[in-house]
From Swiss-Prot:
Its EC number is 3.5.1.5. It is found in: Cytoplasm. This is Urease subunit beta. The lineage of its organism: Bacteria, Pseudomonadati, Pseudomonadota, Betaproteobacteria, Burkholderiales. It catalyses: urea + 2 H2O + H(+) = hydrogencarbonate + 2 NH4(+). One of its GO terms (molecular function) is urease activity. CDD domains: Urease_beta.
């Protein structure tokens, strides 16, 4: 063994086991590309991204840390989201939440605009 060497079993290894995930279809209705980073609260992304924001509350992209997904104008793609962990408190982003994610359900919690 070499110092720092990692010995990994064969096969696939989930990066984030035991956390809820959801798959959503997202469409960019803007005339410019929109890029979303790995740890951005997905429900608070650019308003030109069309998807179920209530379903995305408290979730981020299930991608490797430090990476991003780019949505070209008019592009529709399917993404997998994963629950935020830790204290599940969100500040910043677009300023829609500013506190605990679990203060209520997606339908009653303050912050996110409701879909028509």
């Amino acid at each position: 063994m070499v110092p720092g060497e990692l010995l990994v079993d064969d096969g696939e290894h989930p990066l984030i086991p035991c956390r809820r995930t959801v798959t959503l279809v997202v469409r960019n209705s803007a005339d410019r590309p929109i890029q979303v980073g790995s740890h951005y609260h997905f429900a608070e992304t650019n308003g030109a991204l069309d998807f179920d924001r209530a379903a995305a509350r408290g979730m981020r992209l299930n991608i490797t840390s430090g990476t991003a997904v780019r949505f070209e104008p008019g592009q529709q793609r399917t993404v997998e989201l994963v629950d935020f962990a830790g204290s599940r408190t969100v500040y910043g982003f677009r300023g829609d939440i500013q506190g605990p994610l679990d203060a209520g359900t997606a339908e009653t919690a303050p912050g996110l605009p409701q879909q028509p």
